[in-house]
Amino acid sequence: MKKVNHWINGKNVAVNDYFQTTNPATGEVLADVASGGEAEINQAVAAAKEAFPKWANLPMKERARLMRRLGDLIDQNVPEIAAMETADTGLPIHQTKNVLIPRASHNFEFFAEVCQQMNGKTYPVDDKMLNYTLVQPVGVCALVSPWNVPFMTATWKVAPCLALGNTAVLKMSELSPLTADRLGELALEAGIPAGVLNVVQGYGATAGDALVRHHDVRAVSFTGGTATGRNIMKNAGLKKYSMELGGKSPVLIFEDADIERALDAALFTIFSINGERCTAGSRIFIQQSIYPEFVKRFAERANRLRVGDPNDPNTQVGALISQQHWEKVSGYIRLGIEEGATLLAGGPDKPSDLPAHLKGGNFLRPTVLADVDNRMRVAQEEIFGPVACLLPFKDEAEGLRLANDVEYGLASYIWTQDVSKVLRLARGIEAGMVFVNTQNVRDLRQPFGGVKASGTGREGGEYSFEVFAEMKNVCISMGDHPIPKWGV
């Protein structure tokens, strides 16, 4: 049986307590995983603290070289890492191999460039004073990463953190530990010094809590549920925070939209990554005049999506991360039907046509709930699975009101050919990101983050400075500015 240990100060550290990680498609035990706690966190933070001064003072060009080297190693191992990710998460192999793992490599390439642009600004004052700013690393950072796209999200945090001169302790979700372990190994192979990146496995209540509370941790970058994020900010003390939390993102489709493209994007945005994505367009608002036809075609296509073995390159929807999560998502489907929604595709039960080796897997068919009322729980609460809620709206004003009538505010999607309408809605919609006539297309230069219960702070490009860098002001006198003469 494979054993996954911690990576602390460049060493593979075994412990006494282990838990098992399983393949969500088959139930097969994949590995015994080290269960870290306060002792391992203390060791990892101490190692990161000791490594920080030398790493922070390494020339930017050298840090950039090491970032590129790590990105190259990921590129060289895409098939292996993708297979590992698919086995551990149930994500379809065509998504991990062709999109998610290559994107992880690009994170390091991108931030290798960003770290060489850590330029401050100068502010001359009346020819008598000169102010200038220094952009400096924070110190030891806690990186707490989720299970839905674990390798990509881990690198999305590790790359800017390390490139900007910080050291880190990465705590991956206990549901998806395998690729984080590989990342720790590849970082050392790339030549990143011991202690700069430490990977501690374990549960949130033990390893995660000890990490974010640690007094030597200066910044916390967390991606996960809103309740956990609130708890971290309540208990972890005065630190820098980046919190990317839950979402219930609206899709507004107006009658003048390019319906074919809107249909393509709406299906992709909710059902890709098994629907387990924070930016999923889970509330799809369709203008009344096109509602019946759009709903009919959406449901027909959802019924045709291929659910099955994540290792099959033709599979579009794989297995949900765990049996517990399957029960949660299935329960929401039942709740939606009880609340009065119309079930047009999918349903709360496992597919009946699965092959024998997948019968015990956490599979759900892509589910379409139509005629949803925005006050229903299925429209207000994050389901985090392949469940689309379809709702009609009358006009622009009602569409905007319904889109904003939710506690979350991460992503949003607008479909219309009316530029004036786009400009009004983009300003009025309560979300950190607005995508117009497109699915979620990420550019690493753009800020990523949400408003309201979807979190605080931004990451991406120079916006990653918010959590991973400190701005220091230096004020220099030219020598003859007036100084009050007290006590003369």
Model-derived segments and their meaning:
Residues 1-25:
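Hydrophobic face of amphipathic alpha-helices that form TPR/SEL1-like repeat modules
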Residues 26-32, 217, 252, 306, ...:
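Conserved C-terminal structural/oligomerization subdomain of aldehyde/semialdehyde dehydrogenase
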Residues 46, 68-79, 93-118:
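Long amphipathic alpha-helix in the N-terminal Rossmann-like dinucleotide-binding domain
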Residues 167-169, 343, 433:
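A short hydrophobic/small-residue beta-strand
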Residues 24-89, 289:
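N-terminal alpha-helical segment of soluble enzymes
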Residues 227-373, 436, 483-484:
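ALDH superfamily catalytic-core signature
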Residues 120-261, 393:
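Rossmann-like NAD(P) dinucleotide-binding subdomain of oxidoreductase/dehydrogenase enzymes
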Residues 29-36, 50-57, 143, 251-254, ...:
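Short, well-ordered beta-strand elements within core beta-sheets of diverse protein domains
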